Design a protein with these regions (language model features):
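Active-site loop/helix belt of alpha/beta enzymes
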Residues: 129-221
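A signal for specific C-terminal beta-sheet/loop modules enriched in small/flexible residues
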Residues: 70-75, 128, 177-178
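Soluble or luminal CAZymes and related metallo-dependent hydrolases
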Residues: 6, 95, 150, 154
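ATP-grasp fold ATP-binding core
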Residues: 122-128
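A charged N-terminal "starter" segment
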Residues: 1-91, 97-102, 106-121, 160-164, ...
Length: 221
């Protein structure tokens, strides 16, 4: 049983909390609760979807999400999924620098009757700072052992390559921890990513269009 009124109230509170930022948008991780009824409620409240598989992309499309209201992040991605995400106009978030070549190599996928053939003008890359991610005296996660994301050197190189291939608007994403209930998590994550944004802007000259603070607001079970 789900509390629709509670879901709508919480979504409205979150939106109001960030009303000072006109570019703010909440992306709900479909994997968390792949329920089309809940997705429709969140769509009605102005949220987008965060997808990591073909199934989640298809569900988002079936619920009426399209374009930049969908963000696609995957770390072991078949070409078909990249092509489908591009077909929907989703923001593609690259987990590995080798994915650039994968995108560039896709020219035609018969089963989708869709051509890609070029790098999207808006693209995102997932960052992994390495080491340990600590809040206060607690270790929240160990990005150094994570399979997700690019190093500082890799993401800088990736931005340069993507810029040369026609990308114009860049995003930065990081997945350092999930279900955190401390107030320290997002300020620390934001500090890491905004400092990286300045560094990448200075080194590559790209336009940093957005930063995705992932991980989700935790639930005190």
């Amino acid at each position: 049983i789900y509390d629709e009124r509670g879901i709508r109230e919480n979504a409205a509170r979150l939106k109001q909390a960030f009303s000072w930022n006109k570019g703010y948008k909440e992306y709900f991780a479909v994997k968390a609760t792949p329920n089309p009824f809940l997705l429709n409620i969140l769509k009605d409240m102005g949220c987008g979807t965060d997808c990591s598989s073909m199934t989640e992309l298809m569900m988002s499309r079936a619920c009426g999400f399209s374009g930049p209201d969908i963000m696609f992040s995957s770390n072991d991605t078949p070409p078909e999924e990249f092509a489908y995400a591009k077909k929907l106009g989703a923001i593609i978030n690259l987990d590995d620098i080798t994915h650039i070549q994968c995108l560039d190599d896709i020219t035609h996928i018969q089963c989708l009757e869709e051509t890609l053939g070029h790098i999207p003008e808006t693209i995102s890359c997932r960052f992994n700072p390495g080491g340990l991610f600590k809040i206060s005296n607690d270790i929240m996660d160990n990005p150094g052992d994570s399979k997700y994301g690019m190093t500082t050197e890799q993401i800088g190189q990736a931005f340069k390559i993507l810029k040369e291939k026609g990308a114009k608007h860049f995003g930065i994403h990081a997945f350092l921890a999930s279900n955190t209930v401390t107030n320290e998590y997002y300020p620390m994550l934001a500090k890491i990513l905004f400092e990286l944004a300045v560094k990448l802007k200075e080194e590559t000259g790209v336009h940093i269009a957005f930063i995705n603070l992932s991980g989700g607001i935790g639930i005190p079970y």
